[in-house]
Structure formats: C-alpha cells, structure tokens
C-alpha cells in the first residue's frame, strides 16, 4: 500500500468485552498491508492482546508511541482516547479513534466497520482536525509545584468535606469575580459536550479557539458560563479551598491548598485527529445527543 503512514501504534482499553478480538482484527489487517505495529505495553500487560498477536510487534509505553509512530489508533471509549491524547500530543502524532466503549464522541469509528473505514485513511484519504488542549500549572509559594495537560477540561472542585470553596478568577491578569461554589470547570471545545454540558455550559464547535468558564452550583445565581479566547491566560486563586482538588479530564488530579494559584493556558501543540471523509461534526452531535433529524 502506498501510504503516508508506516508505523502504527495501538492503544487498547483494558477490561473491555471483545477487545482481544477487535485488536486481533486490527493487528492482522495492519500486518497484511505492510505496516509496522507498535502496541501499548499496558494493553499487553492487561491481556487486551492475544499472545500470538504480539509476534512481530513492538511493545512500548504511550510516550514512546508518540516517539516511534506516525499514527496511533485508540481502541476503546472516550476515556481511553483522552488518556492517550495527553501522552501523545506533545509529539504531534495524529490519533484516530475506534469505538469499543459507549458514547464515543471522540472514538467514532464503529468497530464493526473498522477496517473498511481505516483503509481509505491509511491511503491518505481522511479529514484532519485540530483540537486545543489545556496546560495547567499549580503555583504554590511562588513556585511551580505541578503541571498537567487536559483535552476536555480542568476542574477545580470541592473535596470530600462537602463544603463550598471560595476562589478568585482572573483573565489576562484582569479580575473577573470572586466565587463561592462547588467548583469551576475550564473547558475546551472538545470538553464542551462532557462535564461542562452537564453543568449548564454551551456546546462549542470543536474547531473553535476558545475556553469556557463554567461554575459548578454557584452560590450566586448571577454566576454564568463565560466564553473567552484560547489566547487568554486564566488564573484561579484559591482563598478557601478546604480539601479542594484540580482534576484533569476526570482521570488525574492535584490537591490544592489555600492561596494556591492555578494558571491555565492553551498548550502549544494541538491534538490532530483523523476522521473518515464522511465525518460530520453535527451528525455526531445528533447521534450522541439524540437530537431530531431533518423533517424535509
């Protein structure tokens, strides 16, 4: 096959029904077409791959997938995709998602049509889309204590004590407000159909260069979601945090102390997602959110 890709990485979701069969089909397909296959070591260790399918494949960690591969296929749900994206985006390697999970906003190719949909993509016939990521830094006593990336959102939230937290928000060093609430969601357009949507935030078309600030159960009913350019720097100063945390894509977190500052910016590398040529963003929204179809 004359392909712009040569080394294909595969990330699999552990403890998923039929994941071994899906991986077997994909690995066999790629080998038959002459591609070099790299497997995420976690998937191999968690028995997502039949032992015989690892023959002739390279087994590496997710960071090394970004180093050695020129395309990564994610078999799983959106959670698996989010985890892979944070590891691979720094290497600017494109990702394609195959849905082995449930909702599938990001992993859109049904596994039943996996090889039929992938073949044109591997031949160079695809739609490429760039998605922005969040880069967050936790500043404690004037020093950077932690850093993290997020494709969906960074969420400041109250801890197990259950009490409201209080914090100040600044955009480009301009004071916005003091808020008492259960927390604040800073969402990318990709994350606008996730936690942000459940908290009353707007849906943002995936290609927009914007963030939204979405309060979680604010004490003041006048606190509403705000959309800002993704060139903005967001600063959150925690004044009464209790045992608050900052969560990243709902998969990792940092504990927060009083007077900590969380600085949020757009990450310098966008995530590049590849879609089949028949991909339509609003069709995906209709299917996943069960919107009405055209009447005429």
UniProtKB/Swiss-Prot annotation:
- Residues binding NAD(+): 78-79, 152-153, 180, 182, 251
Active-site annotation: 78 (proton acceptor)
Q: Which SUPFAM superfamilies match?
A: NAD kinase/diacylglycerol kinase-like
The record's annotation in InterPro entries points to: ATP-NAD_kinase_N, ATP-NAD_kinase_PpnK-typ_C, NAD/diacylglycerol_kinase_sf, NADK
Q: Which Pfam families match?
A: NAD_kinase, NAD_kinase_C
Q: TM segments? A: none
Q: Could you list this entry's UniProt keywords, alphabetically sorted.
A: ATP-binding, Cytoplasm, Kinase, NAD, NADP, Nucleotide-binding, Transferase
List, separated by semicolons, the cofactors it needs. a divalent metal cation
Molecular function as annotated in GO = ATP binding; metal ion binding; NAD binding; NAD+ kinase activity
Main location (coarse class): cytoplasm
Catalytic activity from the UniProt record: NAD(+) + ATP = ADP + NADP(+) + H(+)
In the Enzyme Commission scheme, what number(s) does this protein have?
2.7.1.23
Please, which domain of life does this record's source organism belong to? Bacteria
A Gene Ontology annotation in the biological process aspect, one of them, is: NADP biosynthetic process
Localization per Swiss-Prot or TrEMBL: Cytoplasm
Q: Which cellular components does GO assign to this protein?
A: cytoplasm
Q: Which HAMAP family match?
A: NAD_kinase (MF_00361)
The similarity annotation says: Belongs to the NAD kinase family.
Q: Which NCBIfam families match?
A: PRK01231.1 (NF002306), PRK04539.1 (NF003391)
Q: What does this protein do?
A: Involved in the regulation of the intracellular balance of NAD and NADP, and is a key enzyme in the biosynthesis of NADP. Catalyzes specifically the phosphorylation on 2'-hydroxyl of the adenosine moiety of NAD to yield NADP.
The protein here is known as NAD kinase
């Amino acid at each position: 096959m004359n392909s712009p890709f040569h080394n294909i990485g595969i990330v699999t979701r552990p403890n998923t029904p039929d994941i071994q069969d899906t991986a077997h089909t994909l690995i066999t397909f790629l080998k038959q077409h002459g591609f070099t296959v790299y497997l995420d070591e976690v998937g191999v260790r968690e028995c997502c791959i039949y032992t015989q399918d690892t023959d002739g494949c390279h087994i590496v960690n997710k960071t090394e997938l970004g180093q050695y591969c020129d395309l990564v296929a994610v078999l799983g749900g959106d959670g698996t995709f989010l985890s892979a994206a944070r590891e691979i985006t720094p290497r600017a390697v494109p990702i394609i998602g195959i849905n082995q999970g449930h909702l599938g906003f990001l992993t859109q190719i049904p596994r039943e049509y996996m090889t039929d949909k992938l073949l044109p993509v591997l031949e160079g016939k695809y739609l490429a889309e760039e998605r922005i990521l969040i880069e967050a830094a936790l500043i404690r006593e004037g020093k950077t204590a932690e850093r993290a990336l997020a494709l969906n959102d960074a969420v400041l939230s109250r801890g197990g004590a259950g009490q409201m937290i209080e914090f100040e928000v600044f955009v480009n060093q301009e004071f916005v407000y003091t808020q008492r609430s259960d927390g604040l969601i800073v969402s990318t357009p990709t994350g606008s159909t996730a936690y942000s949507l459940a908290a009353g935030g707007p849906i943002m078309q995936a290609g927009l260069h914007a963030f939204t600030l979405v309060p979680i159960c604010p004490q003041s009913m006048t606190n509403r979601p705000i959309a800002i350019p993704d060139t903005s720097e967001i600063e959150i100063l925690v004044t009464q945090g209790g045992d608050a945390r900052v969560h990243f894509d709902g998969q990792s977190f940092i504990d927060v102390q009083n007077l900590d500052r969380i600085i949020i910016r757009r990450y310098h590398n966008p995530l590049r997602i590849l879609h089949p040529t028949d991909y339509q963003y609003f069709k995906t929204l209709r299917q996943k959110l069960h919107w009405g179809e055209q009447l005429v």
